[in-house]
Regions:
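Short, low-complexity, intrinsically disordered N-terminal peptides in bacterial proteins
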Residues: 1-11, 456-466
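Conserved beta-strand/loop scaffold segments within soluble protein domains that form the structured core
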Residues: 22, 104, 116-410, 424, ...
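Short arginine-rich
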Residues: 41-50, 423-433
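N-terminal amphipathic, basic helical "cap/leader" segment at the start of enzyme domains
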Residues: 2-148, 329
Length: 466
């Protein structure tokens, strides 16, 4: 399965053409869709041979869903009133389970000239902002079948632009609601920051029925009944600074396929903090391309699985410019019969002198039935680097830490809980909205094994560092 193309019965040239026609897209964007469709037909599901043994899509039935139909006009989404803004947010872009888009901009966002709307509206008014960024597939990895599927068939397109020199201290909130049974929501989000612009983005993904994102529902043979596919395509001009945080809490019957990519010019920086707790299956791929000299990436991603959930967290970082820096950390906690595949690749091109990079992947198993693998990798074509290293481990909670906390008066369960939540806190602390921070902490608490389930777990993996 991993070397074969994705088998999507609903991914047809006719559907891509019809979607483009309904949305009234220009000819060049239809060409983009057809290019993605052609790529999708020949790409392997997993392009990296090192990772092919660790791809499992058995909990997804691609033929059991059909894509949500696009709206003929962006006016179907309308504009929410100012009261719709979450407290402390500069702007809100909300996408419902039927693909309807609502946008609300605060006074500060309007004052700095923030652009946030659908592809349709932007293409009708300021197409010069969009075309140079996405044309020729520049913002979607050419080897990512899941990203190309969204590029070909997206019925929802969101475009966000922060003008050069502008700075937003409060976050732009992008909220997705998904989980409509028998439906797949496919989307593209393009985020552009001009030179020396600064912004915070908080992406929130929740289930349409308000269900808690645990993996307890269903048996191993049952497939997710709803799907969410989405790209996040980030283009950072020279000196731009972006903080991107994400929280995924889809319902237990949803499979999610997230493809995110950032391209960084000279002295630009992006800080990722992504937490995933929901869904039946969650596949996340994050690509960073450090093109410009002095570009910097900081990335932290966590997943907490229970029941029969599967988290597939993959990152690719390519150092191309000189004196670039990346610090990448992925963490997983798994209980029940959940599984975690944490995979990463750092590539240092011959042109990337002075690179400083670290990749860390760590999994904690709370029960003997949970499983995880961590696969950090380096490809170095330039010996003149400041640092290039990786580290990984898979295992149970450190009993030395448990003993220490128990000696300070905590019960065994409380000690284990404190260690796990502290293990995940680096992402929680980065969430820019206090209410969202509290919600994520509550979700993580709720995932904790009840009773005495959280006992010492066996470890199918060891630890290694390079």
């Amino acid at each position: 399965m991993s070397v074969a193309p994705l088998n999507l019965p609903w991914a047809t040239a006719e559907r891509a053409q019809a979607t483009s026609r309904v949305l009234g897209e220009p000819e060049w964007l239809l060409t983009e869709r057809m290019d993605a469709f052609e790529r999708l037909g020949r790409l392997p599901t997993e392009p990296n041979q090192l990772f092919t043994p660790y791809l499992d899509l058995r909990s997804v039935s691609f033929g059991a869903v059909t894509p949500i139909e696009p709206f003929a006009s962006a006016e179907a989404g309308g504009e929410a009133g100012p009261e719709a803004l979450p407290e402390g947010a500069a702007a809100l872009i909300s996408v419902g389970p039927d693909g309807r888009v609502h946008v609300s901009l605060g006074d500060t966002a309007r004052a700095i000239g923030l652009v946030a709307w659908t592809f349709g509206d932007i293409l009708a008014t300021r197409p010069e902002l969009v075309r140079p960024i996405i044309e020729a597939g520049r913002t979607v990895p050419e080897d990512d079948a899941f990203g190309q599927a969204a590029r070909a068939l997206a019925s929802v397109g969101i475009f966000i632009h922060v003008p050069a020199g502008a700075a937003l201290a409060d976050p732009i909130v992008l909220r997705w609601t998904a989980g409509k049974a028998g439906k797949a929501l496919l989307s593209r989000t393009v985020l552009s920051l001009g030179e020396a612009a600064q912004a915070l983005v908080f992406e929130e993904q929740v289930g349409s029925d308000g269900s808690v994102g645990t993996g307890d529902a269903g048996s191993e043979a049952e497939a997710a009944t709803a799907q969410w596919w989405g790209t996040t395509e980030i283009d950072l001009a020279a000196g731009a600074v972006l903080e991107f945080t994400g929280e995924q809490d889809f319902g237990p019957d949803t499979a999610a396929f997230a493809s995110r990519r950032a391209r960084l010019a000279r002295d630009a920086s992006v800080a990722w903090a992504i937490a995933s707790v929901g869904g039946r299956l969650h596949r996340s791929r994050v690509d960073n391309e450090l093109d410009g000299r002095g570009a910097t990436v900081r990335q932290v991603e966590i997943g907490f699985g229970d029941g029969r959930q599967l988290f597939d967290l993959t990152s690719y970082t390519r150092h191309i410019g000189q004196d670039t820096t990346s610090d990448l950390l992925s963490k997983g906690v798994f209980t029940g019969r959940s599984r975690g595949y944490i995979k990463g690749m750092i590539e240092i091109a011959r042109s990337a002198k002075g690179t400083d990079t670290f990749l860390g992947e760590f999994s904690m198993l709370l029960e003997r039935t949970a499983r995880s693998v961590t696969i950090p990798s380096l490809e170095i074509d330039q010996p003149d680097v400041r640092r290039a290293m990786h580290s990984s481990s898979v295992g149970p909670i450190d009993e030395t830490q448990v003993f220490y906390l128990m000696s300070r008066g905590l019960s065994r369960d409380a000690a284990r809980r404190a260690i796990v939540l502290g293990f995940l806190e680096p992402v929680v602390a980065r969430i820019p909205l206090p209410a969202a921070q509290d919600r994520l902490r509550a979700l993580l608490e709720r995932k904790w094994p009840s009773g005495s389930r959280g006992q010492e777990s066996g470890s199918p993996g060891g630890s290694r560092a390079a």
